[in-house]
Structure formats: structure tokens, C-alpha cells
């Protein structure tokens, strides 16, 4: 099941990078101000 482990690590790394960029740059989507 090494493939599953490598896949998990790959997804985790991409997830961390994605969130790092996402939170570094404010999302350009209209927010609802309640």
C-alpha cells in the first residue's frame, strides 16, 4: 500500500501549498456582509 502513502503525501503537500498561497493572497470573490 505504498502507493496510497505516496498519494497521501502528495495531496498533503499540494494542499499546504494551496492554502499558503490562498491565505497569503486574499481570495478575489465577493463576500456576503451580513
Curated annotation (Swiss-Prot):
Regions annotated as coiled coil: none
Top-level taxon of the source organism: Eukaryota
Main location: plastid
Gene Ontology BP annotations: photosynthesis
Membrane topology: Single-pass membrane protein
InterPro entries with a match to the protein in the record: PSII_PsbT, PSII_PsbT_sf
Location of this chain's protein in the cell: Plastid, Chloroplast thylakoid membrane
GO cellular component, one term: chloroplast thylakoid membrane
Pfam family for this entry, one: PsbT
UniProt keyword terms in alphabetical order: Chloroplast, Membrane, Photosynthesis, Photosystem II, Plastid, Thylakoid, Transmembrane, Transmembrane helix
Transmembrane segments: 3-23
Signal sequence bounds: none
Family to which this protein belongs: Belongs to the PsbT family.
PANTHER family xrefs: PHOTOSYSTEM II REACTION CENTER PROTEIN T (PTHR36411:SF2), PTHR36411
HAMAP family: PSII_PsbT
Function: Found at the monomer-monomer interface of the photosystem II (PS II) dimer, plays a role in assembly and dimerization of PSII. PSII is a light-driven water plastoquinone oxidoreductase, using light energy to abstract electrons from H(2)O, generating a proton gradient subsequently used for ATP formation.
Summary of subunit composition and partner proteins: PSII is composed of 1 copy each of membrane proteins PsbA, PsbB, PsbC, PsbD, PsbE, PsbF, PsbH, PsbI, PsbJ, PsbK, PsbL, PsbM, PsbT, PsbY, PsbZ, Psb30/Ycf12, at least 3 peripheral proteins of the oxygen-evolving complex and a large number of cofactors. It forms dimeric complexes.
Protein's UniProt name: Photosystem II reaction center protein T
Amino acid at each position: 500500500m505504498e502507493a496510497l502513502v505516496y498519494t497521501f503525501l502528495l495531496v498533503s503537500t499540494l494542499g499546504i501549498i494551496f492554502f499558503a498561497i490562498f491565505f497569503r493572497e486574499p481570495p478575489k470573490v465577493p463576500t456576503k456582509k451580513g
